[in-house]
Amino acid sequence: MILGPYIAVSPLIVISLGGALLMLAEAFSHRREESHDRRSGPSSDMALGTAITLLAGAVFSGAVGFVGPETLEGFDSLAPYLVMDRFTLFFSFVLCLGGALAALLAGGYLPEHRLDRGEFYPLLTFSTVGAIILAGAGDLLTLFLGLETMSLGAYALTGFRRTSPRSTEAAIKYFLLGSFAAALLLYGGALIYGATGHTDLAGIGEAIAGAKGAAAPNPALLLIGAALVLVGLAFKVSAVPFHMWTPDAYEGAPTPATTFMAVAVKGAAFATLLRVLLGAFGSPALSSWAAGWPPAVAVMALLTMTVANLIAGRQESVKRMLAYSSIAHAGYLLVGVAATVRASEDAQASVMFYLLAYTVSTVGAFGTLILCGSRGAEAVSYEDLSGIGKRHPVAALAFSLFLLSLAGVPPTAGFFGKLYIVKAAMGAELYTLSVALLLNSVLSAYYYLRVLVYMYMREPAPGAPIARPMRSGYVNAALVVSAVLVMVLGIWPTTSLGIAVRAVLASR
């Protein structure tokens, strides 16, 4: 079938063409310096165009991966460089969905905060393209290409508020630490190539396993290279102790950019982490509990969720608290990654479902934070949310739903995400990590419920400005979609989990 490979990469083609059109629209548009109606400024049309582009990418990902035929000729035509299998297409759907919702949030946020510059949207679109390439990378060179394409856009989005010293500082920190992590990953890849003679993940795995008469790789080069690659990817998923950039970057960036980084950058990094660990490093030489990567991932999981939850409870900034919450969720996901050694299919599917549930819950939480801000000012502290439950009950109810999902309270999507992770960990006999995850979930309830206390049980301080949530159709649309998906995934979780299992089995 001649069109096979083009059908497989159709999400990338659609998003890339849409991003190019967005750049042209921005370049040739005649923008007004100041719009009389800030909600109909130049970014409004760009936000809608970006959301449509990324939703089209999500539709193509779902149609090609899960509605089309069980087998598609040409799926492996781009291998080993880019593997557009059902595993990649599942993540492509999640990444496009997260990017589209972030674009809708930006459509309301940017004009409100006088950041109405259209270049935000092409940056977000092409960063999503890089994220999909990263998720489907079957070669270390493609992995690095996707990583940098995604990261360069994320760096620019972090510093998008150019007049803010905090935003500039956050962007510089993110860029410097991100470049250092990328250099470590690149050097690790070079060492792995020197040890195995391969850059494709399948070839690396065969060389390590000694398949097809391959010469035994140099163990010292291999271990050092694998460790450096793991460190580089741990930085992208915000695992402790490589998380220091996350709170500053998330707090300093415009909130829609923070949302995109929290869902798309993290999601793509976990996709490639699974592919690298189970593909290139899946042989017994590197996947044993005695001398392989599972102990390192397990320790990172334990540290990440515990340290992040302890620090999150001490924050006075709600946005910074959500940043540490994002780090804690990376720890929960790492528990699922560690479980893939002994319960591969169930653990991978649980990670994929958790990322979908985490994406819609996180978008909703940051989106409601945008909505609860006063006109032209963000809701930053807990005090800023005082009394929201009485003055704006719908916004408070939405925020409560998303926070309860992040806390893992039934019947939300977040509850079943954690349930499936714990089930996979128990099946892999990771009892310590399972108990630690449950205890950390209880610990996280403190800072999530603290927000509810301020919204429903506290009154604003005397003389404090009364918050008047913005009226934005784009933000409201993103919140409605997120809320519906949180409840749908919570009421019918087995459907999405079954799709994830199909994706895992089809990628083998």
From Swiss-Prot:
Keywords, comma-separated and alphabetical: Cell inner membrane, Cell membrane, Membrane, NAD, Quinone, Translocase, Transmembrane, Transmembrane helix, Transport, Ubiquinone
GO biological process: ATP synthesis coupled electron transport
Catalytic activity: a quinone + NADH + 5 H(+)(in) = a quinol + NAD(+) + 4 H(+)(out)
Mode of membrane association: Multi-pass membrane protein
Pfam family, one: Proton_antipo_M
Enzyme class: translocase
Location relative to the cell: Cell inner membrane
GO molecular function terms listed in the Swiss-Prot or TrEMBL record: NADH dehydrogenase (ubiquinone) activity; NADH:ubiquinone reductase (non-electrogenic) activity; quinone binding
Tagged with keyword NAD: yes
EC nos: 7.1.1.-
This protein's name: NADH-quinone oxidoreductase subunit N 1
